[in-house]
């Protein structure tokens, strides 16, 4: 009898012993998810000595919709990680299915073969990124510390509130680390982003219309799904709009099933997320779930800081301080329409290291402002269009009309297909005249 081999993503990731004394690094990265690992890989590529701090210990799960779009895959290929990812279980999606409250469906094909996406369970996706980051950091004389709790952000008030490092603990032992740049990559509740936004600049950390709440479960044997390759699904349902319900296959007869809605809208719902999900599965989608089984303890909720534009000089939520940058969810860069955040997380990691390389001798507020401006220049149109589409989906009559028309009108399907990969097509999709022309005539 052959022993069953334990999947690699369930194994521990071993790191070097923690250095004693006050060691100075080139860059401290707080957070070992995709944004932090990508930042570390880009930094190691430039030869920087990096300290990566992660509050949990791998293997660990991360609550997410699990979709990884074409933008993220391009960065992973650039970092030479994509081939490793392809060897782990995943689902390839080449289309997106939308349905409305009238049960009308339209399936939009992604015609660009380079833009197809994957659905990866985050437990193995993040493991691969963290393992790669660990190897590259340690090869460059850097360190990775798991189970580390950041307790204090070290701020030099005489140097215009410059962040110079962090203090924290591991197993009740205190440590202090210094670096000319600290990168906040700790997700929605990143201590670095809270220090910058709340403590130093006294700005709003949570803005309910720019903040989404989501709930996820894993189910086996949901009906009407090709578990090898096909569509991810977005469903607009009475009682859930302006939120949406999703079904994302991940392979091996398993789906990531969940729903998301902004905090501003959730407060008006009688049911909370878990109750809403139960209502959808047992009443609206009962036939598709009649033979399905819920994976025990997989139901979890989380929050997403959205990259919807603000009416401020910075356009987006602040993502820099003196001697400090924010990346990924810590920088509030989640797509306002789809809820996908990994692509923008990896992009922001690359841009952060690029700006540090240009100003490594004196990374000040002006450098941080240039970083945020470049992020806006690269993502502003895309995020603005996504925010407009999110606002359109708040109107049930418009969703029903739009999906009904798209089902019958090839020209509208073409715009939708191109909008999945093209900024110009996204602009067309949010143009009132083009929408009016396609919907009415």
Enumerate the predicted regions with their spans.
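Extreme N-terminal leader/targeting segments of oxidoreductases
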Residues: 1-27, 42-48
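Glycine-rich FAD pyrophosphate-binding loop
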Residues: 28, 44-64
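Glycine-rich Rossmann-fold phosphate-binding loop(s) that bind the pyrophosphate
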Residues: 31-33
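Conserved N-terminal glycine-rich FAD pyrophosphate-binding loop of Rossmann-like flavoproteins
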Residues: 57-77
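A conserved beta-strand/loop capping segment in the N-terminal third of enzymes
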Residues: 71-73, 77-127
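Predominantly flavin-linked oxidoreductase catalytic cores and closely associated redox partners
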Residues: 132-291
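FAD/FMN-dependent oxidoreductases across multiple families
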Residues: 265-356, 361-363
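C-terminal helical "tail/cap" subdomain of flavin- and related membrane-associated enzymes
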Residues: 354-441
């Amino acid at each position: 009898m052959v022993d069953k081999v334990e999947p690699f993503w369930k194994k521990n990731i071993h790191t070097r012993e923690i250095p004693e004394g006050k060691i100075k690094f080139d860059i401290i990265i707080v957070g070992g998810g995709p944004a932090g690992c990508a930042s570390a890989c880009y930094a190691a590529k430039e030869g920087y000595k990096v300290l990566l701090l992660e509050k949990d210990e791998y293997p660990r799960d991360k609550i997410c919709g699990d979709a990884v779009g074409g933008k993220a895959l391009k960065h992973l290929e650039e970092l030479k990680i994509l081939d490793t990812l392809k060897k782990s279980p995943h689902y390839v999606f080449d289309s997106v299915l939308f349905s409305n409250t009238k049960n009308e469906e339209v399936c939009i094909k992604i015609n660009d073969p380079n833009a197809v996406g994957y659905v990866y369970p985050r437990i193995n996706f993040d493991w691969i990124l963290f393992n790669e980051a660990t190897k590259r950091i340690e090869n460059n004389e850097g360190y990775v510390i798991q189970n580390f709790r950041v307790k204090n952000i070290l701020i030099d008030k005489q140097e215009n509130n410059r962040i110079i490092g962090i203090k924290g603990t591991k197993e009740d032992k205190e440590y202090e680390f210094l670096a000319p740049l600290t990168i906040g990559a700790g997700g929605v509740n990143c201590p670095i982003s809270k220090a910058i936004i709340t403590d130093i600049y006294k700005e709003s950390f949570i803005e309910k219309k720019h903040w989404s709440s989501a709930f996820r479960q894993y189910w086996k044997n949901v009906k009407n799904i090709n578990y090898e390759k096909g569509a991810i699904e977005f469903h607009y349902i009475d009682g859930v709009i302006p939120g949406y319900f999703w079904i994302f296959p991940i392979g091996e007869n398993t789906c990531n099933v969940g729903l998301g809605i902004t905090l501003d809208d959730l407060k008006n719902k009688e049911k909370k997320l878990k109750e809403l999900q139960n209502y959808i599965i047992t009443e609206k989608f009962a036939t598709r779930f009649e033979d399905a089984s819920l994976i025990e303890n997989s139901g979890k909720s989380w929050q997403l800081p959205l990259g919807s534009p603000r009416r401020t000089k910075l356009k987006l939520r602040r993502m820099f301080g003196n001697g400090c940058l924010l990346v990924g969810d810590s920088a509030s860069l989640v797509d306002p329409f789809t809820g996908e955040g990994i692509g923008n997380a990896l992009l922001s990691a690359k841009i952060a290291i690029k700006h540090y390389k240009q100003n490594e001798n004196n990374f000040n507020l002006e450098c941080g402002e240039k970083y945020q401006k470049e992020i806006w220049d690269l993502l502003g149109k895309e995020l603005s269009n996504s925010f407009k589409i999110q606002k359109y989906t708040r109107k049930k009559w418009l969703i029903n009309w739009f999906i009904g028309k798209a089902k019958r009108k090839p020209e509208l399907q073409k715009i939708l297909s191109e909008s999945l990969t093209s900024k110009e097509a996204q602009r067309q999709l949010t143009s009132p005249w083009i929408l009016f022309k396609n919907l009415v005539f």
